[in-house]
Amino acid sequence: MKYLKALCGVGFFVVLVSNVWSISGWTEIRGVYDDICYLRQAHLFQRFGLDGLDTNISRDDDRYLAEKLKAIDFQTWSDTTTAPCHTLMPEMKKLVMQYPPGTGFVLALFPSGFQVIPLYVLASVVAFGFALVAITYASTVYSLMLVAAFGDAVIYLMINPTKASYSMAPTMMVCVLAGFLTAKLFVDEGRRHRLVLSALIGLLIGLSVNFRLANLFLSAGYFLFFFVSFLLSRNRETLLQGVSFGVTFLVGIAPTLLANAINAGSPFSTTYGGADVASPELDSGVLRAYFADVQFVLLVIAGVWTALKWRSRHQSGMTQAALVVAGNLVVNLFFFMTHPVFTPYYTIPIAMLSLWTLLFATLIPHRETIGDSLTFRQPVKA
């Protein structure tokens, strides 16, 4: 097996190198409005520090946004009051950026003019690293084949469709780690440190909301699970796990709440407008777009895999993990399928969080079963 695992690792490395080679040729000026607004948020952080949470258009006195719009031939680039991705807040008398601050903050960690490439390289390296971790958990040829197919696919997904929005790169990194910890929470042998794991997962999911506001729904399955589990069991451990998840989730979304308070006047007011705040409705065009997209394939795989794990009730904690994933899938699918806008990446976060969780939930108990079997067969020493 060690030679097969080494070969699998080499395959992952080849895909990683291909990613890095492709990413190295990217440009930050590709004519996408969202890109410019995320870069503006990063510029505000680099210029004002944490005060960069205030995205009032009046702070473009250095003409950073205007120059970016000019570079993409935006028709009214000199009039920043017409800037895309900005919303007028009548009560605050401010024109502010609509996005949460997390993506801009992460981009601000890299030098201006060279922010997107290192961010996506980092995202690819994180996926590569956890794919290698999955190799260590593979205990049979079949499980290694699963890891090989999964790892190659997710490393590639770090550039396509992830490159469609800068918010996706940090979101994908969070989904990888949260999926791994979720599997450890429910199916790891002994399930030790459940309180700590619940808190870490809550913090990660909360932090993801700062990258994309829709990532709020990634928490749905966890909240539903902890709530229903407490109603059924009424035990202290379940209550503490749910509370720790909820508290750290709130800590994680604190930057977005603070940004809303500064830009919209209240932590619970939104800076979004237009179609993004439209009432839910079923649109046949949106549904057809999802059915014809790679997102549909990933969601079907996640759904079928969840159903198979639900049937594996003999495996410790597998039903619980499947319930969390199922709850997440249902809530997120309802939201995005009734949202009037389609993009090629909207459901990628829930698909990736679900698939990473299911992968490790499949590998961890199987490796432990093999280990227990080998231990049982060892000769007893006199």
Regions found by a protein language model. Name each.
Residues 116-142, 176-181:
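Transmembrane-helix motifs of polytopic, lipid-linked glycan transferases
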Residues 138-139, 178-197, 208, 362:
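Membrane-interface transmembrane helices that cradle and orient dolichyl/undecaprenyl
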